[in-house]
């Protein structure tokens, strides 16, 4: 899971990672399989409600949060560089509802684009664009109406952007 803006003051982004086997140690060098890059995870965290604490070690079954500078996506794998492993992907569901979404205030375009892209990277919505079109408006696809409500709420409360949503017929 990827979650943006867990701390609004810092606009941080946390990737939640389940340890599948073995032992994880703070500062351990890992391989991000999808990019092929090695990285050190220096500040893994355990989160409980609003509290965060640095974790020195984690074992199979534990879930830790790691700072994500935009490298991770849902379903990514990190492993010991000496023991590369690949998991099959996580299924995505075809959207059933579509809407054109745009910001009410054109001066909020940057916040709108960043918010929509981050929420899409978290897997809450899918974005569709027409070829050679900008980001003034986007077509958003969702599985259920609640996802539109989550999008509107998060854009307003986390990015200070109010949106106009025009539902599209399913075709």
What does each model-found stretch correspond to?
Residues 1-171:
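Structural and coupling elements of P-loop NTPases
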